A protein has these predicted regions:
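Residues at alpha-helix caps and immediate loop-helix transition turns in enzyme cores, especially N-
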Residues: 35, 73-76, 106-107
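Short beta-strand/loop motif that positions the catalytic acidic residue
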Residues: 57, 63-65, 69
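Alpha/beta-hydrolase-fold enzymes
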Residues: 1-35
């Protein structure tokens, strides 16, 4: 693994919405120190385990990702996501979006897509109680 700089996460990497970064930077409950090497090693290790494991089969899965996510780049997460791909898998990669896709400038579009996906895979209440 390449050397990890001893710097905190830049709020600019989270979203194209400047308010998201400002809120992150001013939140006293957010850890603002550098990312620990062990955390990153565990993340990469988890991606590798998922990439070798079983998929989700028929479990409905929606993967949303920002095309410009520098914290979890597509090329790093792609092997695990491809392994999880199952019968009801849908992928939405948003051009220009960064790490916090649900807090992006097009958040309404993203939330609408999540709601649409949930509606498409939800079991009606009457069928669920049978």
């Amino acid at each position: 693994m390449d050397p990890i700089p001893d710097v905190p996460i830049s709020p600019d990497l989270l979203s194209r919405d400047p308010q998201v970064g400002e809120q992150y930077a001013s939140d006293p409950l957010v850890y603002h120190g550098p990312v620990a090497r062990q955390t990153l090693e565990e993340l990469f290790g988890t991606v590798a385990v998922i990439a070798k494991g079983p998929g989700f089969g028929a479990l409905p899965t929606l993967w949303i990702h920002g095309e410009e996510d520098a914290l979890a780049p597509l090329q790093v997460t792609r092997p695990a996501i491809e392994q999880l791909r199952g019968d009801q898998f849908e992928e939405l990669v948003y051009p220009g979006a960064r790490h916090e896709v649900l807090n992006e400038i097009n958040r309404e579009e993203v939330l609408d897509e999540v709601a649409r996906f949930l509606d498409s895979v939800a079991v009606p209440a009457a069928a669920a109680s049978v």
